[in-house]
């Protein structure tokens, strides 16, 4: 549309110049600059109006395709607007680090802790890089600090190859979230090493076992009072008497040993 309007603008000027050269008796007045600009602007607006009219007619003819295109454009615009920045990654990293510090070392997930420690180590050495790709953002590992003046850091022939770039990606930011960091922090308070001493069938709990009737029954039974029979009460009393007698015997033996040692020292 813009090209057609420009052609009209310049062709009008050249046509008038040719008319002056062809006819000796005809006197043509060349329009001024503002007149030509107004003509060109009017032609441009008419072209845009025709294009908008054609687009509206096509949308009325095929509303499904038009809605799909509008949805795709709106989704692309939303992704570009919600692509997280480098400050958002710093905030998410510090938040995850604070959440992990609140847990006891024995209950921390080893994979979550190792991934977070690596990110913090790279951040402390200035080797984290952030790039915004429009629809999403990437955080990747750099071999050196951005301010390093070493020969290996400045020589372009020693830079990492592009084929190795996928292995250097640490996180992907999309629609306002850092997905790899969020995935690694899932169940960060569950340490699988704590359950290694259990039998194999007790290390993994199936989803249907979490709300089973057996679990519900055991949960209710733990609040019930313990009822002991007479035999159990007599057995408990007898065991208590035996324990008290053993304590008295040990105490008497310890006192006798102390007296013997004091006599020997004299």
UniProtKB/Swiss-Prot annotation:
Top-level taxon: Eukaryota
Name used for this protein in its record: Mitochondrial import inner membrane translocase subunit Tim29
GO aspect biological process, one term: protein insertion into mitochondrial inner membrane
One Pfam assignment: Tim29
Entry's transmembrane regions: 66-83
Complex formation: Component of the TIM22 complex, which core is composed of TIMM22, associated with TIMM10 (TIMM10A and/or TIMM10B), TIMM9, AGK and TIMM29. Interacts with TIMM10B; the interaction is direct. Interacts with TOMM40; linking the TIM22 complex to the TOM complex. Interacts with TIMM22 (when oxidized); the interaction is direct.
An example molecular function term from Gene Ontology annotations: protein transporter activity
Keyword hit for Nucleus: no
Membrane topology: Single-pass membrane protein
Species name: Mus musculus (Mouse)
């Amino acid at each position: 549309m813009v090209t057609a309007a420009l052609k009209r603008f310049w062709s009008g000027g050249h046509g008038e110049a040719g008319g002056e050269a062809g006819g000796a008796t005809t006197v043509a007045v060349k329009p001024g600059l503002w007149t030509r600009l107004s003509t060109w602007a009017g032609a441009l607006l008419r072209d845009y109006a025709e294009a908008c009219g054609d687009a509206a007619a096509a949308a009325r003819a095929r509303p499904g395709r038009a809605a799909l295109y509008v949805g795709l454009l709106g989704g692309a615009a939303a992704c570009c607007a919600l692509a997280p920045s480098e400050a958002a990654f710093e905030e998410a990293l510090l938040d995850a680090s604070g959440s992990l510090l609140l847990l006891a070392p024995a209950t921390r997930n080893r994979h979550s802790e190792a991934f977070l420690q690596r990110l913090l180590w790279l951040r402390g050495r200035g080797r984290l890089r952030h790039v915004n790709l429009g629809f999403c953002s990437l955080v990747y590992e750099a071999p050196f600090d951005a301010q390093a003046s070493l020969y290996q850091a400045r020589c372009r022939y020693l830079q990492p190859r592009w084929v190795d770039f996928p292995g250097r990606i640490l996180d992907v930011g999309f629609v306002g979230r850092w997905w790899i960091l969020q995935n690694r922090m899932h169940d960060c308070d569950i340490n699988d090493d704590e359950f290694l001493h259990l039998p194999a069938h007790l290390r993994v709990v199936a989803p249907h076992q979490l709300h089973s009737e057996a679990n519900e029954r055991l949960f209710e039974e733990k609040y019930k009072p313990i009822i002991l029979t007479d035999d159990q009460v007599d057995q408990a009393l007898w065991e208590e008497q035996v324990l008290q007698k053993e304590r008295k015997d040990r105490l008497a033996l310890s006192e006798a040993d102390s007296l013997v040692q004091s006599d020997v020292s004299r």
